[in-house]
Amino acid sequence: MLIEIPNVFSKEEVNQLREELDARTWIDGNQTSGVMASTRKRNQQLDKDDPVALQIGELIMARLLAHPLFVSAALPLQFYPPLFNRYQGGETFGYHIDNAIRSTSEGMVRTDLSATLFLSEPDTYQGGELVIQDTYGQQSIKLAAGSLVLYPSTSLHQVTPVTSGERTAAFMWLQSMVRDEGQRRLLFQLDQSIQALTAQAASEQELFNLTGVYHNLLRRWSEL
């Protein structure tokens, strides 16, 4: 399941974030790569311990945890804190699948879901599409600045070469309360239906029944 979430941050907020990020020292992105990824990856990143990156990462996580669509789709349990990358001058990241487990200072995170928050407007750079291969085929993603795409970490994906301009983004992984992607999809569809029926003033009994089904399935499938 691939979900696009528009306007996580406003244009004004993105401009402020970019001013802070652009002023930092960017390093070779392969300093965070495994052996296989290092042969396919050419980009720049901020150090994971950069204080500004950490501060903005906290802001991103807080914003996402307050976003109903993100919470409904991801059912987040634990984040691997956001990182920041930049592509320019032909830089690219060829097809790969993200590592299954990530280590943080607080323990291990199983990467159930990956997310990219775009911080460059699509008309300011050429190339740089996030191409994701999933059960519905290949999808090419290039969103407005401030918008986010969420997709299963099991997906084969790449960032195509940026042939002009500059593509800056935040990327992150998270462990969901529900490990299985198919179960998460069913819960998401059910939750969206409940919200739609609520907006249509459906009968109270119908909503009680559906909400009960949702929470009983979540109780059965969740791992905490």
Swiss-Prot record:
Domain of life where this protein originates: Bacteria
Enzyme Commission number(s) of this protein: 1.14.11.-
Gene Ontology biological process terms from the UniProt entry: DNA damage response; intracellular iron ion homeostasis
InterPro entries per record: Oxoglu/Fe-dep_dioxygenase_dom, PKHD_C, PKHD_hydroxylase, Pro_4_hyd_alph, Pro_4_hyd_alph_FE2OG_OXY
One Pfam family named in its UniProt record: PKHD_C
SMART domains noted in UniProt: P4Hc
Cofactors: Fe(2+); L-ascorbate
Binding site for 2-oxoglutarate: 167
Domain Fe2OG dioxygenase: 78-176
Any one GO molecular function term: 2-oxoglutarate-dependent dioxygenase activity
Positions annotated to bind Fe cation: 96, 98, 157
Keyword hit for DNA damage: no
Entry note: cofactor: Binds 1 Fe(2+) ion per subunit.
The protein's name in its UniProt record: PKHD-type hydroxylase Shewmr4_3244
Native species: Shewanella sp. (strain MR-4)
